[in-house]
Amino acid sequence: MKQMKSLLENPHGFSVSLVFDGLLVGIFAGCISVIYRLLLNNAEKLLFTIIAFTKTRPFWIAVWFIVLIIMGLIVGWLMSWEGMASGSGIPQVQGEMKGYLNQNWHRVLCSKIIGGTLCILGGLSLGREGPSVQLGAMAAKGIAKITKRSQTKERYMMTCGAGAGLAAAFNAPLAGVMFSLEELQKNFNSSMLVCIISGCVTSDFISKNVFGLSPVFDFHLKAALPLVHYWMLILLGILLGLCGAFYNFIMLKGQDLFGAMKKIPAKYRIVFPFVVSGIVCYTLPSILAGGHAMISLITGHTLLVSTMLLLLVAKFFFSAFCFGSGAPGGIFFPLLILGAYLGAIYGTLVIQASGIPSYYLVNFITISMAGFFTAIVRAPITGILLIAEMTGTFEHFLSLAVVCIISYLVAHLLKSEPIYESLLGRILAKNGFKESEDADHKVLRGFAVGTGSIAAKQLVKDIPWPEHCLIVTLNRGDEEIIARGSTEIHAGDTIIALIDDNYLGMVTESIQLICGEIIPE
């Protein structure tokens, strides 16, 4: 109850303290994400150096395969030691935000950094961005635990850390902010917003001091696509929506494939993608690791459609195989690479058929990255901001928005569940779904009241609030209103609720239904 009393007595002080908490989280999450990014960058460089050295030396090829098997065994042991470090890491953070999971922050940090580095050194088709989100969140959780912050502040700081991790991974602070709100929280208040912004900006500042000011993708967009050609974007959006739904289906089937290997202990299954990676090293090395080599191929060379299609299909199934094993690594960057290749193939065909200038090919590549991301993750605003920041220009905002909206609708109509929600559901099922064990802790959460929601224009006492929560205050603009039974709730208010942490996930979902906008059928 101490945190509630503090908030009621000094709500502005609570918000101000969150700014400094965000700065602190941004420093530590940014440093950890930068270290992780440096390790993975150097691991990838070392990988291609090893391939170049061994490819004409059979003896050293055999030695390299032995090393790959050993690395697979080490990673497998790490994942058995700390299971929450497997996979992307984003579903685990979502689960903790909802109160379903309680990760061991220092074990996750150690196993994720070591395991992720070994996976990239081994050539597995995994990304650094999802792990960076988890590393940032765990760094924030560690700070909150060490400094003995309240449960409410710990959740805020973890959300901030997750965004800061993404900001450092992509040099994209706005995308980091929006990802935290759109994908992790689903709603927000001003206190949370300033905390996340301060963390993401601080983290991005640290990242840019190490990696420079250049965007992650150095695309040179000559001109925006003329409005007369927007029919091409409609078709592209439909294609990306279909491909995004198929991507989600295959990624989950990849997990099913490894899950069916009942006779092989889980810690040994990760060896399989390392062995397959060894074969890929000497047959199609461009699809190894995150995919930076693939991007340079379509931006610096003119490839045949058949060549791009081969690389696309190979990268797609190799990524599904690697991710399905439970290896510590994400799908964030690889899916952007796949989106880029879908755009390159589509753009090449459209340019050949319509005769529009060839420099529009880069437009199709960048737009497709955002559209494919949106179809898979179902976070359109994050997708638009991420690609805009990564390419260093906001001139193509309209075309990005058109494709993202269409791909979102197509994937939704196909009833394709957002990938991270599907993965979280599997994690909860695997762990027997245990709510947080901290039954004596209470957490303050904010819920925005939507226009036309159940709560709008109702008295507090007339709403069937779920058990295990207490409505504390209503934030209406800059005004802080003590919630009483006779208090009327307005659309646009932010309801502050005190929730038993043992029932956080269930209560949060119930209040979101009450406060969310009702969409007519």
What are these regions (language model features)?
Residues 486-487, 507-521:
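Short, compositionally biased
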Residues 1-432, 450-451, 476-477, 492, ...:
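Alpha-helical transmembrane segments and immediately membrane-proximal extracytoplasmic
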Residues 294, 442-446, 494:
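Intrinsic-disorder/low-complexity, polar/charged segments enriched in Ser/Thr/Lys/Arg/Asp/Glu/Gln
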Residues 365-366, 376-377, 439-441, 464-466, ...:
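A structural signal for short secondary-structure junctions
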Residues 419-446, 516-521:
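Long, charged amphipathic helices and adjacent flexible linkers at domain junctions
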Residues 93, 440-442, 482:
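Short, solvent-exposed coil/turn segments
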Residues 110-118, 440-469:
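Acidic, Ser/Thr-rich low-complexity segments on the non-lumenal side of membrane proteins
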Residues 451-505:
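Cytosolic Rossmann-like ligand/nucleotide-binding regulatory domains
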